[in-house]
Amino acid sequence: MLRKYEAMFILDQDTQDVNALSSRMIEIISKDGKVIEKNDLGLIEFAYKINHKKKGHYFVVIVEATAEAIKEFERIANIEKNVVRTLIINTENEQGYEQSVQLSKTDMTKFEEERKAKRDFKKPFVKKEFNKPTEKRTFEKPAEVTVEVKEVVVEEVKQTVKPAKKVAEAKVEEVSHEEAHDFVSKMEAKYKAHLAETVEEHVEEVEVEEAKTTAKKPAAPKMSAAERAKVDGSHNIDEERYELQKYSNKLRSVAIEKNLPKKLQEVNLRDLTKKELIEYMRKVRAALAK
């Protein structure tokens, strides 16, 4: 449904192609509608700086437009860095509206001047008189009360610390080297359809090749572990993540002990998905088998 709108937008004073950008903004807001009247007010000085700039190119346009076109205009205005201000009014809601781009209700120059005038107002200084206290009163806390409070606090701390140690001890669970190897074999057999057919054996060569590729191509934005888990098939793995990380921790300690390639020693296991943890364990086992 077409409605009548009056829109004002200001372009940055340093915009390279003012005509092209203003035409694009007017074309967006008038899509599936029509332009009734428009006016280029030119380069006008602001009442106060906007984005550290003193001037801007003002444009006023009266259009019949759809709600979708208005939303798209506002979206592009938020993205385009050279559009510094926008203001849109629905003329059907304005009482006594007079259609004119010369007497535009969206022209913010008067509004800015009023704001600037208000800033010049200074609140009169009123000196307050404070009565000086005639005497200072000191409150002495009874020694017995202080001792009792300290004893209670110490006892509470002791009671709180003890169960915390038990919880920490309960969480520690060690696995052997052999158990880790058996677990990897079990995962390979169970998820054969979701894992890579072969494991990279020459890790150092892969690192060198990746370094060359990285130097030639710009770095792509890195996905988080949660984002990668949605696309790499981790949802097909039934085991809990803490169980996979438990065996991965063991194999990483073996990789450090056997001085395997740094890529296997310095990996951040917390940043790996379920599938990536299984692939990591396969790589460590393959490196140990050399």
From Swiss-Prot:
Belongs to the bacterial ribosomal protein bS6 family. InterPro entries: Ribosomal_bS6, Ribosomal_bS6_sf, Ribosomal_S6_plastid/chlpt, Transl_elong_EF1B/ribsomal_bS6. Keywords: Ribonucleoprotein, Ribosomal protein, RNA-binding, rRNA-binding. GO terms for biological process: translation. The lineage of its organism: Bacteria, Bacillati, Mycoplasmatota, Mollicutes, Entomoplasmatales. Residues 208-233 are annotated as: Disordered. Binds together with bS18 to 16S ribosomal RNA. It comes from Mesoplasma florum (strain ATCC 33453 / NBRC 100688 / NCTC 11704 / L1). Pfam families: Ribosomal_S6. PANTHER family: MITOCHONDRIAL 28S RIBOSOMAL PROTEIN S6, SMALL RIBOSOMAL SUBUNIT PROTEIN BS6M. GO terms for molecular function: small ribosomal subunit rRNA binding; structural constituent of ribosome. The gene is rpsF. One of its GO terms (cellular component) is cytoplasm. This is Small ribosomal subunit protein bS6. NCBIfam families: S6.
